[in-house]
Amino acid sequence: MGEHNLLNPGFVGPLVNIHTGDTFYFPNFRASGAQLPGLPSLSYPRRDNVCSLPWPSAEPCNGYPQPYLGSPVSLNPPFGRTCELARVEDSKGYYREPCAEGGGGGLKREERGREPGAGPGAALLQLEPSGPPALGFKYDYTASGGGGDGSTGPPHDPPSCQSLESDSSSSLLNEGNKSASAGDPGSLVSPLNPGGGLSASGAPWYPIHSRSRKKRKPYSKLQLAELEGEFLVNEFITRQRRRELSDRLNLSDQQVKIWFQNRRMKKKRLLLREQALSFF
């Protein structure tokens, strides 16, 4: 039997929670690791290139991202790219180095904005995703210059609302000037000046919604004589008498009613004027 000490596998196994079915004892080996004189010593040549690395040992090579150092390189790059940078959270202070294929596409947005001479056009060029077109990126301003055939064109910014408004107003003004200079007979006519065209202050595209005033139609002498005679008989005409007058004088019922109202007001003004003159 072997020596009973703490280095014996029979005692060490249960202590480290390793249960083995069979326990082997080697009486020729001691606990100190020294061999007996009867066993021959085996020599193994040392090989330095067993665990040699393909890169220099001075460069750090680890698979975990280190803060404020170079980013890790994935061993299996997707989509056939030569260099794929791992995505890290923005809350951590990791800086990613530019990729060889993307042309600086891996830089952070803050670092792009700090570069000298970076304008709105440059920001659009830099923010373009460097992935393949099959992924279907939403915003691609650099390749939107051409049509649907995939031809590339110069980058351009989308037009703003102010530019659209200015273009529309200028086009309307130009059309109005052309129509005014040509003297189109079908143009809008002002109700105040039917014979002439538009006024200088009027806009050609602005529709005139003002209601034209109805032309005044004066009463004839025969109608006035009949109405005056009826007023002398009765200032307040009845409905039946009003209908008879309207039918006989070829007037509407409303016209007869309004004429009697105006005639009563005229009589009242004359009475007030006579009273005012009598005091002096």
From Swiss-Prot:
Residue spans binding DNA: 212-271
Coiled coil regions in record: none
Assigned GO CC terms: nucleus
Primary residence: nucleus
Biased composition regions of type Low complexity, renumbered to the chain: 159-173
GO MF terms held by the record: DNA-binding transcription factor activity, RNA polymerase II-specific; sequence-specific double-stranded DNA binding
This protein's UniProt keywords: Developmental protein, DNA-binding, Homeobox, Nucleus, Transcription, Transcription regulation
InterPro entries reported in the protein's UniProt record: HD, HD_metazoa, Homeobox_CS, Homeodomain-like_sf
SMART domains: HOX
Segments of this protein annotated with the region Disordered: 95-212
Localisation per UniProt entry: Nucleus
Role description: Sequence-specific transcription factor which is part of a developmental regulatory system that provides cells with specific positional identities on the anterior-posterior axis.
Family: Belongs to the Abd-B homeobox family.
Name the record gives this protein: Homeobox protein Hox-C12
